[in-house]
């Protein structure tokens, strides 16, 4: 939001210096991002007169001018290429050493085609005061030669640039900013009433609103017999100062009121409107040639203003070229309306149009100012262009319901920690437009129509505190009682942190990918349901919520491979989505390894290089589970009911019991890699952290006592012949279950298939460690345990001890 100091003073009677006003604006929540003072930037530029202009001896399009720069100085020679440079012309001169804003360089003494030039005659574009660059500036003949140009031209009006927060739509106009400053004791607020202008005849154009939810209020007035020409110089200067281009009086009035009162309006050339106006939804396929020169194709989600001919305006966003006002306009229709904020935002985003009107309507304008805004526009049209006004046509209810809030005065102390008297509270709120009725301890506060952002007691406290001064709020540390502190992190947050550390420790690099993926990718990983499709995706290939982290990691791995880094290991811990309910959202830990990126390390090595395998992915998954507190002894590997994205013969599921699947690991299916446009092979894993069962005992900071046995451990090896389909894990669990206190370790050290073994059999060798606690074991006791192990494995697997 830009405004000039003189513009602000039209609404605020103040003598405060600019710097103090800017500081106060920032302190009350209207952050001043910058101040542009053209008088300082253009200080070196002076008014000069061209005495002679002769053709350059070595260039057809250049002239050698002698210039009177005033102050009794000798004439200066300047080489100029402007077509309008001529003797007797009064213009703007820049001496050597002057910084030229538009060209971003400092002028020096030049030599142009063999002729010395000791300065520059300037165009308006070079001074960045307009877009005119066709010739040098032409000033009146009586302009004082030698005087500072900026001071003479009235450019000493600083421009403030305010960064508005989305909730302060009332300050999208200079009037609202002045109101806030007046409440902060920076001056007296000027708020003259707006008198209705009596119509001289009935308006011949009627208005129909088909959907009042899109347009709660609409007002229209015809002004006949106008003479549309340039707007007054003061208005043109204000619009130019804030970056707008003056067009003609009718259009400039609407732009002025947009920034002055945050009241966007639109003007139609009445001669170009056919029949009556209808506010409706656009028909699919309808088009509009808009004022920006572009043709837009519309659909039924866009609200438009149409006549008998078709669409004439994008409601609340931009008017149409065919009904726009020009110098030939003699009858003008002035429109002032209220529009649905959400529809304006969605339509503007869909069409890719950003306008000052859209900016204000999508944040909400003052509904009570719809009719006064029309009256003020009518007054300015008649003042600048003449004409005779009609009666006003009003459709809908432009008035918002009164909002009354019961406000306990103690809320200021409770929420902000400062004491503010009722007298001061009344003063502040009254200056801001609120009405306060009643006495302590609870008063009733009526919210003004332009403050749609104020909904409750906390909002009123905010208004009081920002005017009193946020710097008045004391620094109050939180009280810390004697009770022990509760954990800051939830269990899932702890698991997330530990999983990240475990994977980083294994050499994987963390990646952060989009939560959105394309529909085909989502379907390949079990997603793609209609409820997971985005209503308004930011890109066509980011249309669905991800059911897995792996599509993003696979794409990242392939992108690195395409750029010369084929060997890498990536992981991510983030949300995945199985449905649209909160309970369908899970925290997953996933990773991929590609190329020579096994657990042993990345890239080639003197000792040999090995491609990453499913066992590397399994080790990564187990590292996550161990870090997250899973009961590792109870984990099982299953090879049935695997997801379609895994290779059926080189993958597995990690589960506890037959139902609770914690995750998957293995090599990705070649068909899925082809669908994702990735080169294989790739190995991957995914663990759902919420599926890990809670520990039976509450975690404690106290470490368990270290128990070391004084007796030697005993190790025994066993080899069993079992069917090939028997899982090795079944043998390990059977052996461990014989005596969980005595047996401290069971590990597999050999699996053999081949000569001497039946084709449908295999030999599995395990090492069992016994750790006595009370005494040294005798041979008989060892043999008894060994016999139990053989019997239990035989019973559970159907195998036999290998001879």
Swiss-Prot record:
Q: Which reaction does it catalyse?
A: tRNA(Phe) + L-phenylalanine + ATP = L-phenylalanyl-tRNA(Phe) + AMP + diphosphate + H(+)
Q: Which UniProt keywords apply?
A: Aminoacyl-tRNA synthetase, ATP-binding, Cytoplasm, Ligase, Magnesium, Metal-binding, Nucleotide-binding, Protein biosynthesis, RNA-binding, tRNA-binding
User: Superkingdom of the source?
Assistant: Bacteria
UniProt EC number: 6.1.1.20
One cellular component GO annotation, for this chain's record? phenylalanine-tRNA ligase complex
Q: Which GO terms describe its biological process?
A: phenylalanyl-tRNA aminoacylation
Query: What are the FDX-ACB domain coordinates in residue numbering?
Result: 709-802
Provide the primary localization. Answer: cytoplasm
- Which enzyme class, named as a word? ligase
> Which proteins does it associate with, and in what oligomeric form?
Tetramer of two alpha and two beta subunits.
Q: What is this protein called?
A: Phenylalanine--tRNA ligase beta subunit
Q: What's the source species' lineage? A: Bacteria, Pseudomonadati, Pseudomonadota, Alphaproteobacteria, Hyphomicrobiales
């Amino acid at each position: 939001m830009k405004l000039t100091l003189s513009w602000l003073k039209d609404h605020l009677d103040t003598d405060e210096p600019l710097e103090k006003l800017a500081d106060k604006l920032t302190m009350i929540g209207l952050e001043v991002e910058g101040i542009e003072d053209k008088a300082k930037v253009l200080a070196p530029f002076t008014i000069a007169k061209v005495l002679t202009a002769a053709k350059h001896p070595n260039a057809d399009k250049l002239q050698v001018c002698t210039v009177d720069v005033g102050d009794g100085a000798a004439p200066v020679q300047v080489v100029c290429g402007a077509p309008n440079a001529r003797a007797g012309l009064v213009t703007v001169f820049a001496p050597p050493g002057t910084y030229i804003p538009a060209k971003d360089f400092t002028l020096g003494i030049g030599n142009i085609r063999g002729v010395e030039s000791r300065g520059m005659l300037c165009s308006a574009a070079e001074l960045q005061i307009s877009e005119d660059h066709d010739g040098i500036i032409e000033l009146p003949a009586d302009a004082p030669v030698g005087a500072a140009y900026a001071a003479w031209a009235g450019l000493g009006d600083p421009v403030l640039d305010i960064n508005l927060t989305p909730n302060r739509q009332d300050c999208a106009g200079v009037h609202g900013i002045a109101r806030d400053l007046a409440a902060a004791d920076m001056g007296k607020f000027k708020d003259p009433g707006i008198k209705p202008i009596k119509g001289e005849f009935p308006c011949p154009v009627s208005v129909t609103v088909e959907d009042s939810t899109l347009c709660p209020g609409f007002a229209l007035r015809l002004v006949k017999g106008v003479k549309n020409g340039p707007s007054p110089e003061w208005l043109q200067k204000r619009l130019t100062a804030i970056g707008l281009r003056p067009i003609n009086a009718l259009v400039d009035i609407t732009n002025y009121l947009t920034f002055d009162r945050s009241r966007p309006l639109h003007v139609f050339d009445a001669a170009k409107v056919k029949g009556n106006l209808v506010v409706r939804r656009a028909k699919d396929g309808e088009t509009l040639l808009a004022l920006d020169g572009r043709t837009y194709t519309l659909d039924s989600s866009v609200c438009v203003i149409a006549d008998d001919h078709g669409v004439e305006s994008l409601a609340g966003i931009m008017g149409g070229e065919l009904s726009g006002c020009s110098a030939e306009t003699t009858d003008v229709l002035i429109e002032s309306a209220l529009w649905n904020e959400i529809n304006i935002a969605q339509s503007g985003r869909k069409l890719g149009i950003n306008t000052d009107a859209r900016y204000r309507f999508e944040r909400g304008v003052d509904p009570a100012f719809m009719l006064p805004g029309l009256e003020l526009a009518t007054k300015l049209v008649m003042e600048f262009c003449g004409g005779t006004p009609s009666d006003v046509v009003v459709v809908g209810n432009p008035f918002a319901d009164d909002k009354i809030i019961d406000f306990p005065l103690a809320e200021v102390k409770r929420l902000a920690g400062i004491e503010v008297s009722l007298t001061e509270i009344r003063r502040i709120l009254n200056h801001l437009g609120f009405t306060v009725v009643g006495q302590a301890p609870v008063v009733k506060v009526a919210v003004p129509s332009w403050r749609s952002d104020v909904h409750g007691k906390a909002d009123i406290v905010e208004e009081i505190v920002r005017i009193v001064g946020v710097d008045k709020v004391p620094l109050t540390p939180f009280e810390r009682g004697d009770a022990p502190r509760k954990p800051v992190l939830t269990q899932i947050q702890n698991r997330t942190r530990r999983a990240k550390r475990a994977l980083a420790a294994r050499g994987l690099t963390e990646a952060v990918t989009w939560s959105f993926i394309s529909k085909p990718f989502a379907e390949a990983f079990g997603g793609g349901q209609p409820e997971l499709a985005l209503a308004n995706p930011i890109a066509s290939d980011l249309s669905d919520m991800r059911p897995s982290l792996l599509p993003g990691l696979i794409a990242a791995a392939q992108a690195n491979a395409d750029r010369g880094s084929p060997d890498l290991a990536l992981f991510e811990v983030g949300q995945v989505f199985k449905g649209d309910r909160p309970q369908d959202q899970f925290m997953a830990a996933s990773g991929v390894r590609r190329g020579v990126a096994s657990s042993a390390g990345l890239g080639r090595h003197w000792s040999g290089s090995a491609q990453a395998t499913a066992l590397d992915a399994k080790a990564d998954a187990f590292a996550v589970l161990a870090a997250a507190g899973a009961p590792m002894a109870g984990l099982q590997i299953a090879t049935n009911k695997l997801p379609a994205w895994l290779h059926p013969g080189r993958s597995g599921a990690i589960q506890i019991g037959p139902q609770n699947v914690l995750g998957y690991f293995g090599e990705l299916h070649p068909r899925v890699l082809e669908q994702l446009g990735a080169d294989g092979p790739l190995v991957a894993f995914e663990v759902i952290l919420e599926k890990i069962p809670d520990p039976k005992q509450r975690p404690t900071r106290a470490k368990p006592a270290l128990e070391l046995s004084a007796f030697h451990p005993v190790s025994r090896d066993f080899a069993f012949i079992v069917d090939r389909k028997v899982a090795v894990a079944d043998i390990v669990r059977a052996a461990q279950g014989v005596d969980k206190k005595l047996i401290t370790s069971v590990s597999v050290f050999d699996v053999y298939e081949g000569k001497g073994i039946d084709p449908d059999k295999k030999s599995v060798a395990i090492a069992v460690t016994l750790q006595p606690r009370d005494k040294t074991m005798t041979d008989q006791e060892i043999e008894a345990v060994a016999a139990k192990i053989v019997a239990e494995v035989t019973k559970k697997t159907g195998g036999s001890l290998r001879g």
